[in-house]
Amino acid sequence: MIRIKLGDIFESEMKTLVNTINCVGVMGKGIAKIYKDRYPKMFEEYKDMCTKKLIHTGYLYPYYEDNSVKILNFPTKQHWRSPSKLEYIQEGLNWFIQNYERLKITSIAFPPLGCGNGGLDWETVGPLMYQSLKDLPIDIEIYAPFGTEKSKLQVEFLLVNENKVNKTGVIYEKINNNWLLVLQLIKKLEESEYNIKVGRTIFSKNMLCFYQDMGLI
């Protein structure tokens, strides 16, 4: 049975939880950071495996507690700075389908793979995960991102063609607040009735001095 849910994956009663990871030994953001804090031994083991180049996309790394898979680490990106790719999600899901019996996994909870810091959206990932996992004879929970519309948790939505949407995540860099201040200042000057037209060279030199004073360059 497969269920689509909203909520905290750490409150799941499934025996195995899935963690999303990169392949360079960093768990600094998002759900991976929570796993790192909750399971420090798992993190040290994962970091060591990354150092030995044993972690790669298309392979899910199981972490055992009490002789069973407690955490299944799922690479959704190569480097922590890079966006997730849908092909990595598909490869990992294929690996899981081929290996869950060998790992003796009987119930499992997945986060929205590649969403959040990975840059993929639920409209892409949700249908792919549902269609890949829905026929497996084990208990599966898939947690959608917080704030997902209820209509996008329904089977009718999840059965749409996942190939219609972008397959690479998008990483948006947060703009430096100082630069934002400069842009707003320039806009105000241009709109001002006291705006004095100057040549490009003089303007550039003055702005260069301003940037240096602001510590932007």
Task: Indicate where each model-derived feature is located.
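Macrodomain-like recognition of ADP-ribose-binding/processing modules
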Residues: 1-217
